[in-house]
């Protein structure tokens, strides 16, 4: 595998630049963040790749030399779930094997050497499924570790394969959530468990590790707590102190109704569970900053194990409030904000040393790294030391530089070193220079632009097609992002990759209107009660700016598409004169009937957006209802409606209702449904069909289908079309 990986570099360099197709983009290798060993000379990562020939996925683990960038394959064992550096030296690894010979549904912990992986040995057998392992070697030589899994109400680990079944399929609820994202809730919850691997030295001097005792559920003793919290909770929700004595985790406020509140606390607990976890910033903690009641996230221990850095929002019920960086001192039981007035909302934090930190934050359509000293005052304004692309992970190397994993519009994976003093130091690898599927992609295919919106200057992105010629005209593909508190950013986007759209023969425009994130909290906050006001006006002004500025963009044959909030906007556009500016529309998982918001899972979202429940703020719900009779009577632009059955954020009835309405109005329309997908389409085979239908639909009406012989057509999808029309 390793030799083939490096042969691909030559192939990529030698191949001609070709259009990026859905098959190429979806089937290209997908790599994880690179995790360095203790000395910082070797990194570890995994790669997965889907084959449309075999309809299966291959996964392998690799090592990368952090000086030369050269990679070698460590293992392609498909049973391996995760691998981490154990921390005892620079070559010992700890991994989770996803099978257990003795316990169906259980997993095993194995120890291996990176130079002799085949001779790994089993260190522990675990009775249930677990993920997200973190470990440290203590002063005694033993390994303390934590991982996450499901828990029964009594605190024991939940095993899906051994769980009790009932004669009836009935589900009974006395509280909400009933369902969340893509899952109906059960009595099982998520928890962080701790354990120990005891060290011993064999006769030949080799250190061996074996399980010492069982696992301890650190979350369950706190009534109502859950960590990580689904659906997006993960490894960032908990941490193990470097000395192995403490564990910190995040949980939603257990005393508040889950579906109506975003409040969450950071907890601290001894690794052995000898005391019950307590919320360091909960309502009963004297250290809690006054008026700070929103979500907490990303707790991380300092290198000396004495402090915890974390983020918290001020406002409960507002999921897109500004994250502020705080540091909790274990010894002093105090909480200190850092750069409190900084007008950005950082999303991850890393300790460079005991006094200085680095955070990643959205910033002007990218995710950049910023340095923050431990004594930063409220008015400290961090300066970015990375620029283009979007950082997904950062680790401190032994020389205090950072190992960064990122992506961009033009590369799915980039690895480099950087520091606050020097910026980007050395690029080690980039997927567009490794993978034949991505060869020819470059930053020159993308650029940003600024335009005057409803009340402020706004930013957007332009993506150019293959062999772009400014003397020619290309139909506009106008993409509207979801959220609404989100942004089109310089990052690899599997679900809505602008270059895949562009290489059909479009110039793609992606504006960031009111509500977008990364441009200051005022712009984000301004979306409340303003979906069809400033945000809608921003989109019309973005279209007008493009129409007036770029001669090579054909707005007469333009198309528009968007997911979620973007899909709402598409249907709102359909009911307005602006809808006649487009030849075709595509809406993915969008709301249709205002009152149907009562069916959503996270009620805090809609009740914040519209400033009340659907009975308290009925006018606000109706003011953003694209199904109003006067709007429906204007529907006339061909529209593809996409909605999946497991979307519990915006249930599928919204999509069916919209499609029914379009059909009864006689508007050319099609309904695309995935019974096994949620608010996103992530399955590789489903994603291919999604792109075929979306691109086929817009190509049919924009003229691209006639001008580009290689353009995707609706007929490229092999699934049958149900058409019951006489």
Swiss-Prot record:
Principal subcellular localization: secreted
UniProt-listed Pfam families: Peptidase_S9
GO CC, alphabetical: extracellular region
Gene3D superfamilies in alphabetical order: alpha/beta hydrolase, TolB, C-terminal domain
Active site residues according to the UniProt entry: 564, 647, 679
Subcellular location: Secreted
Keyword vocabulary terms for this entry: Aminopeptidase, Glycoprotein, Hydrolase, Protease, Secreted, Serine protease, Signal
GO BP, sorted A to Z: proteolysis
Domain of life: Eukaryota
Signal peptide feature range: 1-19
Record EC number: 3.4.14.-
InterPro entries the record matches: 6-blade_b-propeller_TolB-like (IPR011042), AB_hydrolase_fold (IPR029058), Peptidase_S9_cat (IPR001375)
Keyword Protease set for record: yes
GO MF assignments: aminopeptidase activity; serine-type endopeptidase activity
Glycan attachment residues as annotated in the record: 90, 97, 154, 260, 384, 399, 454, 530, 611
Summary of the function given for this chain in its UniProt record: Extracellular dipeptidyl-peptidase which removes N-terminal dipeptides sequentially from polypeptides having unsubstituted N-termini.
Family that this chain belongs to: Belongs to the peptidase S9C family.
PANTHER family on file: DIPEPTIDYL-PEPTIDASE 5-RELATED, SERINE PEPTIDASE S9 FAMILY MEMBER
Protein name: Probable dipeptidyl-peptidase 5
Species in which this protein is naturally found: Aspergillus niger (strain ATCC MYA-4892 / CBS 513.88 / FGSC A1513)
Gene: dpp5
